[in-house]
Amino acid sequence: MLIDKLERAFVRLVLLLFGSLKIVGLENIPVEGPYILAVNHMSKADPPLVMISWPPMAKIRFFAAEKWEKHLIFGPLMRHQGAIYINRGEVDRRALRQALAALGEGAVFGLAPEGTRSRVAALIQARDGAAYLASRAGVPIVPVGMVNTDLLGHNMAHLRRTHLETRVGQPFSLPDTVHRPKGDELAACTHLIMIHIAALLPERYWGFYADSPALEALLKGEDPWPACLDVSKAAVPQPET
């Protein structure tokens, strides 16, 4: 549609002024949905950069904080893009149901498993929403790592260009043994998603997952799932989704 083309053109124009974008792993993007696009989140620029990294025919649905719903400019744009507004202060079952319905209709659903923008320029402990959706919808997950977006704001303020990267990993699915996981098993699924994102990123971004035995196993080409289960048992409990 014309609006989609204009939005992409605007993002590309801004990018041309302030930096460059390299996309790695385009061959890993599925031809069609449904699937979950799980990405790290360090900058307000991440969503539009993901949008222009993806093929134009892929309409990406996504969660957005409720505060944007009535924004004069971004509100209408987000509604056009298919945003599902979510209350991030609680488990928003209404938003989760809408996301599951979208996946059931074949959508590509993008979200940051961390649930918010990281303020420490590295991965923070994720919430269980992405794992919940993937397990309930039975869809694959495409991990995405955004590189150098944490530098964008500072560099723009100092009129410096930023060389950005979108790194797309191979799609994967939760283990066949997982059926409607809860508790430790759901936390293990979340850990599995996050180490797949971490594996795409430079080590300086690993953050909360830097010492994960599961990440170490994945990087060695081994099955990380047993280590994910072990790690989840020692994790800080989260509210049940």
Where in this protein do the model-derived segments appear?
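Catalytic core of membrane glycerolipid acyltransferases/transacylases, capturing the structured
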Residues: L2-I3, E7, L16, P30-E90
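Non-catalytic C-terminal accessory region of glycerolipid acyltransferases
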Residues: L2-L6, R94-T241
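Short gly/ser/thr-rich secondary-structure transition/capping motifs
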Residues: L16-V24, V147-D150
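A conditional alpha-helix N-cap/helix-loop micro-motif detector
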Residues: G19, G89-R93, L123
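Membrane-interface helix-loop junction between the first two transmembrane segments
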Residues: K22-E32
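Structural motif corresponding to alpha-helix initiation and N-cap regions
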Residues: I23, H71, R93-L96
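A secondary-structure boundary/capping signal
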Residues: G25, A64-A65, G82, A112-P113, ...
